[in-house]
Amino acid sequence: MWESFFGFKKTPFSDSPDAKQLFASQSWNQVKTRLEFLAQHHGVGLITGEVGAGKSTAARVFTASLNTNLYKILYVHFSSGSALDLLRQIALELDLEPAHFRGDLVRQISGAVVRLNQSKKQHPILICDEAHLLPHPALEQLPLLLNFDMDSSRYLTLLLVGQPLLRRTLSLQMHEALRQRIGVQYHLEGLTRDELDAYLAQQLKAAGVSQPLFDDTARQGMYQATKGIPRKVNKLAMTALRLAAGAKSQTVNEAILLDAAAEAML
């Protein structure tokens, strides 16, 4: 296998790294700061990015860092369905038996959220991943979950995570009530050219290899092909290393990188 050819102790360039392996890019640090603020001050947050930019990873690492005695994470990965389906998913995350009608569901969820805050001293954080797929009626339900009569307390924190389409959707007049509530937002960018070099070195070292395996031309070609998007970088790097091992080459050069980019469809 190509891992043993290069002497790796484990497979590098995983799309699901543990927190210790996360690369602290400038963009990642910006997201981290905003999510920490959101956890402390509550409200609504928005994180967007291209496919593979690391949005879901950012949300996962953020929630893993929280004290489970103080926070309850409600994670909804909504790919299709109606507003009623979304509310049912949220109710299930709250360990509720979902009511049959929309109005009853909203009241049911709101009541559970208040009880969590007041009785268990837990603050719920609702994360809507792939939120760009939410239909308009579903998005219109979210402000209702943030209203608690005349009480100004922020009993529920909402984090919307999705592709750039989500920003365009939220710019519509029908979603002004939700848009005005957004207190923190950030668009997650890819790695810069310098960060790409550092990222490659970090991933190799974490897998047990200290010497560089990508020459200058390969690294430049990788940046041009991936624009620094982490998932694309990981895919291309693994493909290039596999092809290099097959060719008995100890390094990835431009020619190997170009073949890898074609195979990885980048």
Could you tell me what each predicted segment is?
Residues M1-H41, L266:
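A short, basic N-terminal segment
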Residues E3, S82-D85, E97-Q141, M150-R154, ...:
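Mid-core helix/loop region of P-loop NTP-binding domains shared across ATPases and GTPases
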Residues F8-F13, L70-I73, G81-H100:
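Conserved NTP-binding/hydrolysis module of P-loop NTPases
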Residues H41-V61:
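Walker A/P-loop nucleotide-binding motif
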Residues G49, T57, D104-I109, L133-Q141, ...:
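Sensor-1/coupling segment of RecA-like P-loop NTPase cores
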Residues T63-L66, L166-R181, G190:
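Short regulatory helix/loop adjacent to the ATP-binding pocket of P-loop NTPases
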Residues V76-S80, L170, G183-L196:
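Conserved AAA+ ATPase "SRH/arginine-finger" region at the nucleotide-binding site
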Residues A177, D194, A198-L266:
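C-terminal alpha-helical "lid" subdomain
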